[in-house]
């Protein structure tokens, strides 16, 4: 199993209200959170900022994790949820405040019984992703419909296919 490590502030986890629903924080892909008020040069230092934990996932992570605070998960209650997509064609939902806990849910788009498997990295023109290529790009959360969209690569009957999928 691979571990997804993350860096964040204890203060950030307890007071964050920002949603991260797409790559680089917004549809313009600015990579900036211009309304950030919690993190400052004074509190982002080795004493108050650093790794808080690691989440177990089944493959490498290249996609930016997404975040929704105070999300109601049916049968599981309200959680600050971290969504993580892997190169093993999986999407996870974790309680962001409890990295040692199992995922709130996990979806795999592979189906060995139907011949749907991962794409070996050797079958692609992408040498820096190893050993398999699955969900590389950051998914998108559509808050209006409650849908997570992800683009997964998988092999079906030994043929490379690209599928637009949603959860």
Task: Go through the PLM ranges and name each one.
Residues 2-9:
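Sec-dependent signal peptide recognition
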Residues 19-164:
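Mobile, glycine-rich extracellular loop/lid and propeptide segments
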């Amino acid at each position: 199993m691979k571990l997804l490590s993350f860096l964040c502030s204890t203060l950030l986890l307890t007071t964050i209200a920002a949603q991260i629903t797409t790559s680089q924080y917004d549809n313009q892909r600015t990579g900036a959170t211009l309304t950030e008020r919690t993190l400052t040069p004074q509190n982002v230092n080795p004493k108050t900022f650093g790794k808080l934990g690691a989440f177990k996932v089944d493959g490498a992570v290249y996609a930016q994790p997404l975040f929704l605070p105070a999300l109601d998960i049916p049968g599981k209650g309200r959680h600050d949820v971290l969504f993580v997509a892997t190169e093993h064609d999986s999407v996870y939902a974790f309680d962001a405040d409890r990295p040692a806990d199992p995922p709130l849910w996990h979806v795999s788009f592979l189906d060995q019984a139907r011949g749907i498997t991962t794409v070996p990295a050797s079958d692609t023109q992408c040498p820096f992703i190893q050993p398999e290529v699955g969900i590389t790009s950051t998914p998108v959360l559509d808050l209006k419909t409650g849908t997570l969209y992800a683009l997964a690569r998988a092999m079906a009957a030994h043929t490379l296919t690209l599928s637009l999928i949603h959860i």
